[in-house]
Amino acid sequence: MGKLTLLLLVLLGWLQYSLWLGKNGIHDFVRVKEDVAAQEANNSTLKARNDQLFAEIDDLNGGQEAIEERARNELGMIKPGESFYRLVPDQSRRNAGTPSTQNNAQ
């Protein structure tokens, strides 16, 4: 019975070593689990970006309004016969936030 107990203890020790330190053990499992979580986060970011791009494609295929909006905002285009006005803030309001550079002669 002593040999059987010793054999079972050796077998238990070998199984514990394989579980904790061996190939595909607990350490590898935790590392792979973290890698999977990071990849899932990356995938969700890319999926949101893809959804946004598909929505933009559908919008551009849907009509002329989206194309006109992009032409106006990104390219600065206007329709024939339109006048373009740019509103620039007053010089006094623009400089109100900056410190004054006055020289005080004494």
From Swiss-Prot:
Gene Ontology BP annotations: FtsZ-dependent cytokinesis
GO CC annotation terms, alphabetical: cell division site; cell septum; plasma membrane
InterPro entries (alphabetical): Cell_div_FtsB, FtsL/DivIC
Membrane-spanning segments: 4-21
Pfam annotation, one family: DivIC
Coiled-coil blocks: 31-62
Residue ranges, Cytoplasmic side: 1-3
Periplasmic side: 22-106
Membrane protein topology class: Single-pass type II membrane protein
Superkingdom, taxonomy of origin: Bacteria
Gene3D superfamilies assigned to the protein according to its UniProt record, in alphabetical order: 1.20.5.400
Keyword entries, A-Z: Cell cycle, Cell division, Cell inner membrane, Cell membrane, Coiled coil, Membrane, Transmembrane, Transmembrane helix
Compartment(s) where it occurs, according to its Swiss-Prot or TrEMBL record: Cell inner membrane
Keyword Cell membrane tagged: yes
Oligomeric and partner information: Part of a complex composed of FtsB, FtsL and FtsQ.
Family statement: Belongs to the FtsB family.
Protein function: Essential cell division protein. May link together the upstream cell division proteins, which are predominantly cytoplasmic, with the downstream cell division proteins, which are predominantly periplasmic.
Protein name according to UniProt: Cell division protein FtsB
Organism: Yersinia pestis
